[in-house]
Amino acid sequence: MPSPHTNADGALSGSGTSEAASACPRPEKERERLWIVAGDIHGDASLLADTLAAVPELPRADGVIITGDISRAGGGIPSARAVVEAAEELCPVVLAQIGNIDQPQVDAWLDERGINLHRKAREIAPDTAIIGVGGSTFTPFGTPSEFPEARYAEWLKELAARAADHKRLILVSHNPPKDTVCDRTGSGQHVGSRAVREFIEERQPAVGLCGHVHEAAGMQLVGRTQVLNPGSLGSGGYALLRLGEETTLIPRRIGA
């Protein structure tokens, strides 16, 4: 089976030249896949390293998924690089995408490294595709990577077509789906994406991983889809994604 990467046009592919892609083990049907999920790291590379080191399952993890907001505000590529390299020191396979805080050049840098999830479809387990949409819809704060709902709807439609021949779909959207426990701010306002919500309702991926709203850690079903916001890394939130005959999503919190 192919490694978790795509070719130049974003289609799922079984060959590639990126260092990260070549490091990924080839999926074997008899073995469960295990991914560690974290997001909203905001440049705190040492915290990410400490968190990963405290995960009991780290030695057998296939990789780390970073859902967005890799860098600190204004930190750009140097901040993102520190975070990604901290993860790679402990788990060589890392897949990541921008959040709204990350500058556009971070997206290009992730492409250069061959580990980008934003607007990509990759195979990460037998007959299992992961697709990603980073950034967020518009916020009051004018952050660097914000996009209209129509753009998200377009991207998600394209990604679903690329992954159509895979039975199991994993969605990573920095922006949570609208009107869920995962998008509710401290004041009670729901700030998630309608396009992401509609995509989940229509396509019913096995899992929807998100972030963005730090205080909205939680999990709920949207139809049959398990949607999870693990909360910000600063609050100790992360998750385990197990991919075997069943799809299992386990929220975790450091210190809990």
What are these regions (language model features)?
Residues 1-37, 42-46, 59, 246-256:
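Acidic, histidine-bearing metal-coordination/catalytic regions of metal-dependent phosphoesterases
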Residues 4-16, 123-126, 147, 194-202, ...:
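Binuclear metal-dependent phosphoesterase catalytic core
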Residues 19-22, 38, 44-125:
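Core catalytic region of metal-dependent phosphoesterases/phosphodiesterases
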Residues 25-36, 122-132, 164-169, 221-226, ...:
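Beta-strand-turn-beta hairpins that frame and shape the catalytic cleft
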Residues 102-195, 253:
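Conserved catalytic scaffold of divalent metal-dependent phosphoesterases
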